[in-house]
Structures are given as C-alpha cells and as structure tokens.
A protein has these predicted regions:
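Pyridoxal 5′-phosphate
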Residues: 1-242
Length: 242
C-alpha cells in the first residue's frame, strides 16, 4: 500500500544481514517493486558465494564484494541499468562509461570474476545443508545464550549470540587466546562504541548489546572446527563463571 501511495524513488534491501546472518525477503520485495514500478537495489555482499545467485540478476541494482567469495580485497561490483539516472560519486574521468572515474584495477576485476565463477560452480556441487547442520549443532550447544534471529532463515556460516555473564570483550579475548577469532559484530562496525543499529532495531536492549558475540566460518571450515569452537566456548564460559 505504501509503495502504491508514496512512490519512493528507490527501495534498498540487504539479501543477508552482515551482523546476524539472517536472510532478508529480497525476492519478495523485488516482486512488489516490479508490480509498482519502483527501482530496486539489493545489497548481496553477504549472499553471493554462500547461496545460489539465481534471481539476483533480475534486480535493477545489485552490489557484490569480491573478498566475500574468495576474490581479492578492495574490489567489488555494482550491476545497474544500462539506461537511467545513475549519478557518479567519483568524477573527473570517463572510465566505466563516466559512472566511476579513476583507473580500473583490471587484475583485481579479472580475479573477482574468476573467483565468482569458481564459487558458483562449487555452490552447484555442494550441499550446504551439511554446513548448516554443523552450525545448528553449535547453536544447540549454546545453553543459556540467546540466538539473534532464532527461527529465521540464516546464512550457514554466521551466528550472532547474546551470551550470558560477562561483557563480550572478555569472551573475545579469552576465545582469541584459545585460538578462535570471534568478533563483537561485523568488520564494518569495528571500532564503534555505540550500540549496533541492527541489534537495536531487533529489540535488543542497550545493556544486552554488550554481550553479543558474532561467530562466522568459511568454506574451508570443517565439522571438527565447529566442534572445537563448541568446546572452546564451554571452557571460556566456565572460566568466566568463576
């Protein structure tokens, strides 16, 4: 109804949240935008390379990030309509049809394309349900913790949990010493002292956000790695409980 009445200039939706891993209904939103003839932008940085990209190419705008699917850091892409008002943020030169000035990093772009092709092939050959089972076993082991977005569809590699007891900094330090690199949020939010706007929007109280720890894995992560992390979390939990 709001789309029909207000006619926004653009609707933007994340395909998968970078802090919690929760999947967003981008395909359904895209269908609504088609019905009401509203341009649609999908931030697919977290989705591409982890889940099939089918349907993303039909969105008006799609962005992706190379290092999320095995490509080099510092390069990404934006798919946009060949026609239409796309205002450049970097001006000065005619590169990329005048939409982004500056010399292209051709080597990184080609590496990104190769990595994406390889990862999409791997996705077609891999049953990610096994990876989901490893993650689910880890989640089930977190007794006393609250999983953010519990019950919702999520990426197979990301878990954001509200842990009991001490502040997250102590969890992160102790787990790091045990050999596990966990975080207090996404890399995009590192260094910020204010509560995450994502967690706030999900109804997490300000005093609870200081106990949220994010766990994520990669394609090479094994069942044994998840099991070792489970033991590490339990050990640290006992230490913090005194």
């Amino acid at each position: 109804m709001r789309l029909a009445e207000q006619r926004p200039g653009l609707i933007a939706v994340m395909a998968a949240n970078n802090e919690t891993g929760v999947l967003q209904p981008w395909a359904e939103v895209h269908d609504l935008c088609l019905t009401h003839k509203v341009p649609f932008f999908c931030d697919a940085a977290q989705w591409i390379g982890k889940l099939p990209a089918k349907g993303l190419g039909e969105c008006d705008f799609v962005s992706g990030c190379a290092h999320k699917f095995g490509g080099p850091k510092g390069v990404g892409f934006l798919k946009c309509p060949s026609q239409g008002p796309v205002r450049s943020q970097l001006v000065g030169g005619p590169q990329e049809e005048g939409r982004r000035a500056g010399t292209e990093n051709v080597a990184s772009v080609l590496s990104m394309m190769a990595a994406l092709k390889e990862r999409e092939t791997l996705l077609a050959e891999t049953d990610t349900q096994e990876k989901e089972a490893w993650r689910n076993a880890f989640v089930m082991s977190l007794v006393g913790a609250k999983i953010l977005g519990q019950g919702e569809g999520r990426l197979w590699n990301t878990v954001s949990a509200l842990l009991p007891g001490d502040c997250r900094a102590r969890w992160v330090v102790k787990l790091d010493k045990a050999g596990f690199a966990v975080s207090t949020g996404s890399a995009c939010a590192s260094g910020k002292e204010s509560p995450s706007h994502v967690l706030t929007a999900m109804g997490v109280a300000a005093d609870e956000t200081d106990r949220v720890v994010r766990f994520s894995s990669g394609w090479e992560t094994t069942a044994e790695d998840w099991q070792a992390l489970t033991k590490g979390v339990h050990t640290v939990g006992r230490e913090l409980a005194g």
